[in-house]
């Protein structure tokens, strides 16, 4: 009987999953955008999220407030909040329960919700898993017009219709 309980405990433990919260002090999401006349970038260092982990990431959910992106130019940021209708659509969210890992490379097949629209995307990244933390980095691109965003213009020329997104997200064990 004692063996049965020990085996049952080991069996249950081997299938346990751990929920890890994001360390938002050490996590960022960056974007860069371009116009014919100039390029700019912004950073959000107030990111929320969680992963389900059992020797690899099986699920991930990340959220960031639109208002927390900072390009270093308050006028541009203010105009961005208007264009992105931040009062109506305050958050950007990503969720995946379908990931593929090969070595330290990871592919998340998931959904991004931006400007009230949800789209399926593939996000490529790397995972650095050590004793105290899991660090996930990567890049992807989104096309604002696919999210019903009217592109802002300067001197009658619209900005380019893509945003490069990069992320460096840390989860403490």
Predicted regions and their residues:
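Sec-dependent N-terminal signal peptides
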Residues: 3-16
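Low-complexity, acidic/polar, glycine-enriched regions of mature
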Residues: 17-173
């Amino acid at each position: 009987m004692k063996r049965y309980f020990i085996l049952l405990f080991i069996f249950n433990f081997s299938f346990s999953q751990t929920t890890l919260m994001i360390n938002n002090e050490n996590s960022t999401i960056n974007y860069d955008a371009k116009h014919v006349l100039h390029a700019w970038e912004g950073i959000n260092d107030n990111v929320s999220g969680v992963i389900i982990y059992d020797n690899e990431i099986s699920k991930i959910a990340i959220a960031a407030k639109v208002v927390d992106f900072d390009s270093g130019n308050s006028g541009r940021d203010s105009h961005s909040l208007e264009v992105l209708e931040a009062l109506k659509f305050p958050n950007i969210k990503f969720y995946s329960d379908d990931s593929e890992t090969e070595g330290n490379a990871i592919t998340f097949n998931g959904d991004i919700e931006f400007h009230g629209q949800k789209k399926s995307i593939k996000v490529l990244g790397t995972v650095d898993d050590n004793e105290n933390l899991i660090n996930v980095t990567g890049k992807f691109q989104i096309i604002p017009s696919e999210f019903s965003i009217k592109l802002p213009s300067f001197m009658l020329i619209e900005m380019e219709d893509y945003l490069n997104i990069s992320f460096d997200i840390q989860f403490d064990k």
